[in-house]
């Protein structure tokens, strides 16, 4: 069966703190997968590496057949993550919050405007953008 996520020997440190140490796992297409652990176990760090928000120290990360070393742009366009706590800025409009998050994935300018317009119409939230 096809693996949609393959993590092999992943390591990530912050100075002397080893946040992720030699982590390996895979998720097969169609499989239900839960990523559980105590606070400080490296769950958020691992997900941040998978999304390209943090650089790994070593190991390999392959998502949908794309290695994050070479195919991060393709990966981030297919991958979505929702964290337990809100990452939205209450002082910004819906439009500006979406713009700042989209920029993290390289979606800016005309592409952002076009995609926002399409999604706002499809999901019926044009009236709350500003």
Model-derived features: positions:
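Short coil-to-beta microelement around the adenine-binding A-loop and adjacent beta1/P-loop entry
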Residues: 17-18, 73
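Short hydrophobic beta-strand immediately N-terminal to the Walker A/P-loop
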Residues: 33-35, 47
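Walker A (P-loop) phosphate-binding loop of ABC-type ATPase nucleotide-binding domains
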Residues: 38-42
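Conserved ABC transporter NBD signature motif
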Residues: 51, 59-70, 75
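Conserved ABC ATPase "signature" region
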Residues: 99, 103, 110-128
């Amino acid at each position: 069966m096809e693996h949609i996520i393959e993590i092999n020997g992943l390591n990530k440190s912050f100075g002397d703190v080893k946040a992720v140490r030699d982590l390996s796992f895979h998720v097969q297409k169609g499989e239900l997968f839960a990523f559980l652990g105590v606070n400080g176990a490296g769950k958020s760090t691992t997900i941040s590496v998978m999304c390209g928000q943090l650089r790994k120290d070593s190991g390999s990360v392959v998502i949908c057949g794309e290695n994050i070393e070479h195919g991060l742009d393709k990966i981030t366009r297919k991958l979505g993550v929702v964290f337990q706590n809100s990452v939205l800025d209450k002082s910004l409009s819906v439009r500006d919050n979406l713009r700042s998050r989209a920029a993290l994935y390289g979606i800016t300018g005309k592409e952002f405007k076009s995609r926002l317009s399409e999604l706002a119409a499809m999901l019926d939230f044009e009236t709350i953008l500003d």
